[in-house]
Design a protein with these regions (language model features):
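N-acyltransferase acceptor-side catalytic subdomain
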Residues: 1-404
């Protein structure tokens, strides 16, 4: 490829400098004025999309807070590609996993079948942003032909590391379609999934968005928004220096209360929120609800160049439709006011369709070391891809928009 690379393993992201990592993770200029609230003439949508989750700050916060560590079953094992001068040309955020929790691409059935057949499914390699079902680059390199050659080298390096560690597999999840195609050419099995995203059709106000819906859906959303704020509930958008420790204390209480009730054990530690608030607060929007002078619920969002990413939600009081208001309607309103092109509200949830979030295909790629297991999974994925494509078309008919 013309460039001699040395590939090595880093057991912490801090073995790579923040500036060098970020130059590969987000090589475009990034639109850091997304938080300014200044009026725009068009949507924010760039070829070099800034993705907050692959930034050094976000991944470092996961490690520094011990949300990600060997004890949690997420042992950092990042792949670094350097030249003869030590300059960084490629990185892969990679982890050795001893379980399949916190991934949002489900392979529990594969693990169970392999274990029953006498194999060891764990350890496995996971290339992703832990606990974050949001699409973003995974083979981090500069754009263009030279970067493509580096990505090819990284794809092969992951297989080499898998073999050296005697791991069962490599799983690259929530990657962009072009990386999915590249990994397919390197022998990875290709998998598709479905999420629900909202797209901004150049709406000027939330009412403009409502006007695009059928009359019935429009009335339902208006009623839900009114009911959500019944009893004097107010909503507040907090960002930057407004993300004080007392605010994070309140949100963490929501996160733990809801997470413990729904999932058993939330993944993130309290320290994580302070760290991201300090290092990337200008990329965070915390949508909080207050009643009788106290915080009662909140939704944590991260802002890319053109996308608002909804991540975590929690509440200590139950109010009808408050979850929809904070996670879906307020997110749409924020995106409209900031001229963002999309809202990604996390994994799963067909109930989002009625609120304007439409089915969208997401991607993962999987290298399976055992030939027999690889053949079985390949057959399964062939059927699953057909099902996902058919489901996307079927669910699109349930969209709430007016039919001309």
């Amino acid at each position: 490829m013309g460039l001699e690379l040395t590939l090595r393993i880093a057991h912490s992201i801090h073995e790579a400098g923040a500036d060098a990592w970020d130059a590969l993770a987000n090589p475009g200029p990034g639109d850091r004025s997304a938080m300014s609230g200044q009026p725009e003439t068009g949507l924010r949508c760039t070829d070099a999309e800034y993705n907050p989750f692959v930034s050094h700050a976000f991944l470092s916060a996961l490690e520094r807070s011990n949300s990600v560590c060997a004890r949690a079953g997420w042992q950092p094992l990042h792949i670094l590609a350097t030249d003869s001068q030590g300059a960084l040309h490629g990185v892969v955020p990679c982890y050795v996993k001893s379980h399949s929790q916190g991934e949002y691409v489900f392979d529990h059935g594969w693990a169970d079948a392999y274990e029953r057949a006498g194999g060891n499914y764990y350890p496995k390699l996971q290339v992703s942003v832990p606990f974050t079902p949001a699409t973003g680059p995974r083979l981090l390199a500069q754009p263009g032909p030279k970067g493509d050659a580096v990505r090819d080298a990284l794809a092969d390096a992951l297989i080499d590391v898998c073999k050296r560690l005697d791991a069962s597999s490599v799983h690259v999840t929530f990657l962009p379609e072009h990386e999915w195609a590249l990994l397919g050419a390197h022998g990875y099995l290709k998998r598709t999934h479905q999420q629900f995203h909202w797209s901004n059709a150049r709406y000027v106000t939330f009412d403009c968005f409502l006007a695009a819906l059928s009359s019935r859906k429009r009335k339902i959303i208006r009623r839900e928004r009114e009911d959500a704020l019944h009893g004097g509930i107010t909503v507040h958008w907090l960002t930057g220096t407004e993300l004080t420790e007392s605010v994070w204390d309140a949100f963490f209480k929501f996160y733990m209360h809801t997470g413990s009730r729904k999932w058993g054990r939330p993944y993130l530690t309290r320290a994580f929120f302070s760290l991201v608030g300090e290092s990337m607060g200008d990329r965070i929007v915390l949508i909080m609800a207050k009643r009788a002078g106290g915080w009662i619920a909140g939704a944590l969002n991260f802002v890319g160049s053109s996308t608002l990413f909804g991540r975590h939600w929690g509440a200590i009081e139950h109010h009808p439709f408050l979850h929809f208001e904070l996670c879906y309607y307020q997110a749409i309103q924020y995106a409209i006011e900031r001229r963002l092109a999309r809202v990604e509200a996390g994994a799963q949830g067909e109930h989002k369709i009625a609120r304007g979030y439409l089915p969208t295909i997401t991607y993962s790629a999987h290298y399976i070391a055992d030939p027999a297991l690889r053949r079985a999974i390949a057959e399964f994925l062939k059927r699953e891809r057909s099902y996902v494509a058919a489901a996307e078309q079927e669910l699109a008919f349930a969209a709430p928009f007016r039919r001309e």
